Amino acid sequence: MVTGELKSKIDNLWEIFWTGGLTNPLDVIEQMTYLMFIRDLDDADNIHAKEAAMLGLPHKSIFAGEIQIGDRKIDGSQLKWSTFHDFPAAKMYSTMQEWVFPFIKNLHGDKESAYSKYMGDAIFKVPTPLMLDKIVTTMDAIYEQMEQIKSADTRGDVCLLYTSPSPRD
């Protein structure tokens, strides 16, 4: 069940995209999906690390150690949503554009995999650091609200609201 407060936050997220110049609903949905994936990747990695620790099993984080993108390297922890969401807007934007997005595009090393084929043409379209900062802050608030609700169907309801361009209703 989506509350009025949660719907308002989702409407606000749409508004950020629209006022920031991304007015094509398909582009907005695409960018939201990429950002949700990036956040969920961090969450899933954290959950797997906790489960492995509880069971006394080894865990190899996808963010562990140095990550090579092209001919450059970065500490993998810098690619985690939980790390870069606290960066100043300009640093967050450059990290997303130069590191995080290329990282998710090449996450599956096999160039022939379905993942690689779908992500191969992916483009980060958020035009400004301030806009990305607002989007990330709003998405964090949405995820926090979803966690408080803890309803099994909330995630699906939120995805439906993400895909309906509310500000134009």
For the regions a protein language model found, what residue spans apply to each?
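Non-catalytic, mostly N-terminal accessory regions of nucleic-acid modification and defense proteins
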Residues: 1-164, 168
